[in-house]
């Protein structure tokens, strides 16, 4: 399989973690390398609905939209519940994890200087309301969101909490259950190895970059 996405810690991260957890081989490719173009806008027209990530399963089959890809992989990694009601609840929680993308992923992955400070200030303000329903689930069901078993929604929630913990851990000081959740999640098969080998993240708030094979590349939607 081939996973196509930007140089960015966002929608593709939970997908990568699921594939590592399920021991599913894949190749991660930037869109400009996969499509042979200089920037994302040059290849956007060739992508279903013009969005990434996409998962190339074989020469004839491509999936798009992160939620669809996650649900497809959940059936291969035993991270989708069998009970239909619980399955619907897991779907709903996964959909709500997308509320973290702009305040967390974009703030630390793309914003710089004054804009970064403004976005971080806003994140600090809205975070309690964003986290509360997830935290309630951890208190009711822990160590994961619905039980002692991780479902695919846990992978998405972990991604955002891990990024927040690494970039502004003080914002989670009042949420010990999230620390417990992250520590338990990192014990899942394949997760620790993935975290040790994924690109390192530097320059937060100034010049964000991700390290690939010793070379640090700016985050974003273009070749640099």
List where the protein language model places each region.
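Alpha-helical packing segments of well-folded alpha/beta enzyme cores
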Residues: 15, 126-130, 134, 160, ...
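Residue-level recognition of oxygen-bearing side chains
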Residues: 68, 177, 190
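Alpha-helical recognition domains of nuclear gene-regulatory proteins
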Residues: 18, 72, 133, 137, ...
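GST superfamily/GST-like fold recognition
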Residues: 90, 145-187, 195
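Surface-exposed helix-capping loop/turn segments at secondary-structure junctions
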Residues: 79, 136-148, 189-195
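Acidic/histidine-enriched, glycine/proline-rich intrinsically disordered or flexible terminal extensions
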Residues: 198-224
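Hydrophobic/aromatic-lined pockets within catalytic cores
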Residues: 74, 78, 98, 139, ...
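GST-like domain detector, emphasizing the conserved glutathione-binding G-site
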Residues: 1-129, 140, 219-224
């Amino acid at each position: 399989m081939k996973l196509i996405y930007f140089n960015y810690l966002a929608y593709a991260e939970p997908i990568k973690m699921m594939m590592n957890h399920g021991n599913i081989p894949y190749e991660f490719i930037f869109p400009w390398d996969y499509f042979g173009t200089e920037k994302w806008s040059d290849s956007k027209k060739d992508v279903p609905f013009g969005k990434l990530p996409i998962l190339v399963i074989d020469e004839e089959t491509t999936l798009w939209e992160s939620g669809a890809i996650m649900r497809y992989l959940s059936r291969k990694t035993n991270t989708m519940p069998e009970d239909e009601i619980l399955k619907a609840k897991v779907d709903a929680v996964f959909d709500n994890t997308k509320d973290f993308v702009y305040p967390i992923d974009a703030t630390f992955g793309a914003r710089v200087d004054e804009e970064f400070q403004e976005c971080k200030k806003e994140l600090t303000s809205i975070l309690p309301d964003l986290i509360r329903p997830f935290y309630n689930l951890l208190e009711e069901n822990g160590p994961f969101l619905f039980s002692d078993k991780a479902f695919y929604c846990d992978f998405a929630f972990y991604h955002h909490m891990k990024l927040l913990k690494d970039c502004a851990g003080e914002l989670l000081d009042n949420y010990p259950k999230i620390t417990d959740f992250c520590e338990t999640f990192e014990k899942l098969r394949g997760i620790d190895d993935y975290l040790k080998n994924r690109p390192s993240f530097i320059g937060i708030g100034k010049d964000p970059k991700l390290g690939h094979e010793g070379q640090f590349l700016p985050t974003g939607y273009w070749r640099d």
